[in-house]
């Protein structure tokens, strides 16, 4: 430690210099104010002051605080923090020398006393051990004397028993000789029987060995089985059975008791989990009664006797229309995790409580090796449908003819001429957008016509028309030939196995070519009769009326060949051709009766809907009371708008019809939800990028069900990878307040096709500023949705070269580095544009033009044929002969094709 002066020390201990000098003098150390003080001198001064002012403190107390936080769980599952402070106090006591000597003496005396007590305890223990050894020796001598006396008595008993045995042995020898003679004769007789038994036993053993080898080969371990020799109990009472067993043991107690006594007398270990109960011991003892010497052999108690089958058990699994994963696992007697694992292998994700459809459950069950029995849960529906009164007599009926073909080929005009009415002029845009059902009385008989739309959007309508028809009239324009919807109509007719009659329309035009139409149709399997085929080709003109009679005769001739018949009397059945919601009349369905007679007041079941026929009208709007086979009518009175294509059936009971309709609705909902929940692995990556896709939401309302279906399909087909059309809601009828609210909530476009919004809906549309559009032609609707989708597409970026400069020289600049002295050879060079540096026509750098100067002046643009200095940002390896290409990025708006 560095020495300090007296003055400094006085300042440290906060006392005066004179007082400190006086204290040093009293301690025998003469000092002045400027003299230095050593550590030894400080210690001497401190000792002097302690002696003078009294002793130093006897004890020193140290205090320490520690703070921490403890989380204590509280009510409601929440925890609260509690601040904890731990205070520790430690006291150090300075012992007086005399006191220390006194304490040391006390400790020494205590140690000596403990040693003395330990020595006395050892002596006492030694004395007790000697006394115990003496007692044990005396007891051993007493036991030896007693054992010797017992052995002497046993020896005497043994000698007497031997004498008695010798006397009885002589008598028994004579008796045994006589018995041996009789036994010899008996042995010879039994030997033959034993030989036969041994042969039988050898054969049985060989069979058992062979079966054991087969079981071992199949992986089945035989379980040792004990031979149950116990008697059957006469009574079922438990106490009576125990008493009966006790009596049996007393009677047969001599058998094997000596050998089993030691085993049964052993005490069981305390706490043994597998200790046998009393009933188990009784059962085991009873099972071993007849054994030799009391020995019994058997499988240990508590051993699992179930063995895993060598082969999987195949079960008959009955599956309804929907089933949960857990129920399917129970039916197959496997764990639910195994079913989920099997579904993941098939590419479907599911949980234990998820509802899956019948097809998925069938695939999973068959994959796991079980036989599937599909059950249709429609007993009520079958009972209602079977309880129908249909007449047995079938009568000839009128043919149902569907007119199909490409758009604008003259289908409706042809039918218009046949009916002698102006139907085509009433269609919006001059194209058919519904299925028109008409029956026409001709001189040769009645014909029912179905006029289908030819536009590409109405594929499902044409398919329904082909399914409900007997004959298809394919209209082909002689000047236009085969078109896409013509090919589609041929495919629908072939799928429905319906004969074709080809009407070559517009034959009066100068550019009409009949042979061209025949050649083109022959490529799709429609061969004319004159070429050896089956199709009739009739040249007609819907405008001039040429060939119309020939077409009708061809239709009736084809109908005669088909021999069309139907049951006229009885409960009717048919199909829904079209359906819509009329504001005044409610749900309206156009029904084509196939068989039976539909009467006003009949109870009908139609898909998910039911009701009583309140009124019927024909295609002219006239009220009718009944409709026979092949007659199209409009019916009123259904509970809702049915789907086009649904079966219409007349039933007896309205209550049962309602139950069937509700059952169909619930089942359809279950199946729909089950299919929606199915999440396949291949869709997982599509869902990951779903946020990057723009969506055009549409709420669609139309006048008829077929138009809703056609427009929905057309709009969904417009979807691309970047923009998707989503039909938020659709329906038949006018635009209501509910539709407007739905469009506002989902930010959707309201589209009305041949319908209008009511007053309440218009208020919501105005207040929410919704986009409402009315259409009457499907072309315009699709084009405008395409335009809306095009506006959501991200623009395409294109690079356009605006200038090219050749490096003539390179200069060094302290501010920008290498500066290229260039000559502009093409276009213009603009500042802050992206550039490319080309060397030998190869791009070696792509960056930004940082500096552009001409005659030491910064400029924004240099034109063709002028010199300039170019500084490239973050690039200094510019050489003479390089080309600097300047370009700009322009955006090009994309459109939906």
Swiss-Prot record:
Positions of the UniProt region annotated as Disordered: 52-310
Stretch list, region G3: 451-454
Location within or outside the cell: Cytoplasm
Alphabetic keyword roster: Cytoplasm, GTP-binding, Initiation factor, Nucleotide-binding, Protein biosynthesis
Residue span of region G1: 405-412
Region named G2: 430-434
Binding site for GTP: 405-412, 451-455, 505-508
Xref: PROSITE patterns: G_TR_2 (PS51722), IF2 (PS01176)
Record's compositionally biased regions (Basic residues): 256-272
Composition-biased stretches (Polar residues): 68-82
Region feature (G4): 505-508
GO MF term list: GTP binding; GTPase activity; guanosine tetraphosphate binding; translation initiation factor activity
Top-rank lineage group of the source organism: Bacteria
Presence of the UniProt keyword Nucleotide-binding in the record: yes
Record's protein name: Translation initiation factor IF-2
Gene from which the chain derives: infB
